[in-house]
């Protein structure tokens, strides 16, 4: 996921401003930029709506680049996982399918305990969303996650398809 995350930075709200030679240059068509901005705004809205502490909400604009990179990295990693395991039937282990284990491994990377004061500090100053929201904000945007866990509209983390983030 980390490699996909870093690759995706080349096409996030900041990276997209640089051309193939690393020069700051607006190389996107007006229509492409408009569509990207519209789709990125969906991501901003998702993270703006997360209440990280009572009365305190995430800053989707400030964390946009990292959230896009998390989203893209997760998609790239899942596609690589499926391609790498396509020829080998992986077993169910401890009641979990390989796909479920993939998403649980992603979630495990971001599991942490931080003090309430640090939640407030990071929400105001860090361009990365808090670990919990790098999971709970990202996974409901990924169709394969719904399939892996049989998520339905009755589940609390369900997001209708037409409301999910789709940058590319």
Positions of PLM-derived features:
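Short alpha-helix carrying the canonical HExxH Zn2+-binding catalytic motif
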Residues: 1-11
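Zinc-dependent metallohydrolase catalytic domains
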Residues: 10-168
């Amino acid at each position: 996921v980390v490699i996909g995350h870093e690759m995706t930075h080349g096409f996030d709200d900041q990276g997209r401003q640089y051309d193939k030679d690393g020069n700051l240059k607006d190389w996107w068509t007006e229509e492409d930029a408009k569509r990207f901005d519209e789709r990125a705004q969906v991501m901003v809205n998702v993270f703006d709506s997360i209440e990280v502490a009572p009365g305190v909400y995430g800053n989707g604009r400030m964390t946009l680049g990292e959230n896009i990179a998390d989203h893209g990295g997760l998609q790239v990693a899942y596609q690589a996982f499926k391609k790498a395991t396509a020829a080998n039937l992986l077993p169910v282990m401890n009641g979990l399918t390989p796909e479920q284990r993939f998403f649980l491994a992603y979630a495990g990377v971001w599991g942490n305990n931080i003090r309430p004061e640090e939640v407030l500090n990071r929400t105001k100053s860090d361009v990365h969303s808090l670990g919990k929201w790098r999971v709970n904000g990202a996974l409901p945007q990924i169709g394969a996650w719904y399939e892996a866990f049989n998520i339905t509209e009755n589940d609390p983390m369900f997001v209708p398809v037409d409301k999910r983030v789709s940058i590319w």
